[in-house]
Amino acid sequence: MKLRQAANHPQLIDPEYAHDSGKFDEVIQTIETIVAGRHKVLVFSSFVKHLDLLRTHLESTGVGFAYLTGSRTQRQREEAVKMFQNKQSCSLFLISLKAGGVGLNLTAADYVFILDPWWNPASEMQALNRAHRIGQENRVFVYRFISNNTIEEKIQKLQERKRELAETFVTSNNPLRSLSEKEMLELFA
């Protein structure tokens, strides 16, 4: 887990780290560009501490945002959704991947950021589906932020392999015959 956190921002594993993070800086720059165009963005991370770093930065810049993690009450959750959906000044919705996986309809968003890849591609798809709902009138753009030469690239390859295995399983007449024991274990791991 520490390798995944370090790929996002070294400060996630070393609070005393006082230098820049290329990935974090890229996320901030991309947010500034998109928000300047009056777009709305869902920002997902599997690390609440990562969202907290982003939250601290946004508070210092005055960019309007909503925030949702698993620690929020149902009422806070509903208020955050309402604020993002209805207030033009609320440009971003920071959401922990697990908290945002179920029961959210966020059609005001036209951009989705995945700040860190998750081992299970289905979890990411659930997050992306928050913006792809009935009532969505905008085209939705997805940005996946992946740090080069890190564990994130390996996770991305694993996700692709799992998607391929799932596709084989779904489209084959008798999918179990075409999968080796190793592939079955990978699919359900």
PLM features: residue spans?
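Conserved Helicase C-terminal RecA-like lobe
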Residues: 1-104, 175, 181-189
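SF2 helicase/translocase ATPase core recognition
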Residues: 76, 91-179
